[in-house]
Amino acid sequence: DSQRRDLDVSSDISRYIPDETPWTIIMMQSRKQAVKTAAFYWFEEDVYGYWTQINHVGGYNNTDATFVVDDESVFVAGDIFKVPRTGEVMRVVSVNSGAHSVTVTGYRGYGETAAVALLDDDYLVCLGNAMEERSSAPTEKLVQPTKLYNYTEIMRTTFGGSGTVLAEQQVTSEQERSRLTRSKGIDHRLALERKLLFGERKEDLTNKRRMTRGIEKFITTNVYDAGGTMTETEFDTYVCEPVFKYGSKTKVLVASPRLVSILNGFGKEKLQVSHGAKEYGLDLQEYVSPHGRLVIAPSRALEQYYAYHSFIIDMQYVKYRPLRDTTLRRNIQNPDVDGFLDEYLTEVGLEFRVQKSHMTVKNATG
């Protein structure tokens, strides 16, 4: 029965007034990858660190050769490290993971700078190894990938009317069913954006119900609290500088209307038309900072409590993962009903990688 057939409308729904949810539009059109199960997994590997700090209240004198540090895993035997404050360079002889210490016996002041006393919290930076001629292979540094997961969530938006509504000639050129199809498509997409931003992960085994985790819950490292007024210098220093430390140099700023107003008050030369957004049918601007570009995607979801919140998302590390992409299901009412009942149905989850490359900005009030 063609009237009861489910229609694949994933591309159509992304075109209904695209400026309502620009970030979701970009996700649906460019970052989509289907999943085969309601629970899906991915692996990610963090970059190996190369900074640590001295962790000893009294510090160390210029002859000590074993140091307790915050993170000894940045070193292996044979590595060279530097104390930036003093300029001293040392060579690692051994690493004790149980004691969180490194030993440099015989290799204090190994470069051009003499050994100097170390202070608690002095920074140490690993410069890599310096191997002798005909040396054996150095000890490997291995980082085990982390297994992450999320669930797909079923979302349904229904709409209907009586047989009389179907039969009546409308005063407007658009028939009631067509109007509802369009307006409820927008509602469905707005709800999708809220879930992808604010959702929390849950599998209710008793009721066979799942929820997908959203952006807000994934971001844990870069959370900047503006605490009120945010200047252009503060935005560049405390937002752009850390968020562009990892990942790509062009990211999407899912912005509240208030943050859009704040950015509009900054230097006009920093706001440019985003030509990359044109291919999605979007008319967006970019904020050009010394550290990277932010494509500004205003979001209607960021209102009320979230009116002063915004999210910076590195699009290369997120994916829209549908198990069942958006379909328009016509005539799902019982056969004896004098009328129609249609619905949009989507079952989708969010894949979110390298959370250090994203950021939450909150409490930016002016």
Where do the model's predicted regions map?
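Flexible, glycine/threonine- and acidic-rich loop/arm segments that mediate assembly and lattice contacts
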Residues: 1-288, 293, 298-366
